[in-house]
Amino acid sequence: MIKFLTSLPLMLTLMLWTIPAKAELLSVHADVPLSFSPTQEGADTPDSISGARVGLSLFILPLGIAYESYEVSYTSDSVDSKDTYQIASVFVNLPVPVINIALGAGAGMVTGEGELSNGTKLTADDSAATSFFATLGYPILPLFDVHAGYQVINANKVDVKDSSNVVRDENDPSGTVWTAGIKLGF
């Protein structure tokens, strides 16, 4: 028993020495959208996507929170429009060695507006949206990682109306987003 008690500190020291230390107490994530692909059949291809997703996670819990806001713009001969996505998410950082994996889900709203070529303003009803995303990151430095992400946004179809409240079209703002980002630990 005495041999065991005297060798216990040595064994614990060796075990702790081989386990990588996580020095970060808090990490901040920032992602930018690279592309957006609508899931609606026959939908126009977006001209641009802008915005960001920012998130915070604590070392104590593998959970984090994120907020994202994207603006997707479409231009055609007959109409210019944009959809604005605002989604709050919760994500979990998976304990995988060497790479950083995060899986998340969220909910929010999509608002749409547009203008016909003759100057008529269009508005779409607000659409409830859900979001699921995954990011895969690689640590470059001990407290810094770069990652790529894929996100699926499901939203309800909504009516697009003109200023006279006449339904002109139906819009499905659902789609997929590719993102790139960084994570900094503190």
Question: Where is each model-derived feature located?
Answer:
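Predominantly the C-terminal beta-signal and adjacent terminal strand-loop region
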Residues: 73, 132, 138-186
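Repeated loop/turn-to-beta-strand initiation elements of outer-membrane beta-barrel proteins
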Residues: 26-28, 60-66, 98-103, 142-148
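Hydrophobic alpha-helix-in-membranes signature
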Residues: 8, 19, 32, 61, ...
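Flexible, solvent-exposed loop segments that connect beta-strands
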Residues: 34-48, 67-86, 109-128, 155-174
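Cleavable N-terminal export/targeting peptides
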Residues: 1-27
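Short glycine/proline- and aromatic-enriched beta-strand/turn motifs that initiate or cap beta-hairpins
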Residues: 21-77, 177-185
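Residues on the lipid-exposed face of transmembrane beta-strands in outer-membrane beta-barrel proteins
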Residues: 52-58, 90-96, 105-107, 134-138, ...
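Surface-exposed, polar helix/loop patches in the mature regions of secreted/periplasmic/lumenal proteins
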Residues: 92-138, 142-143
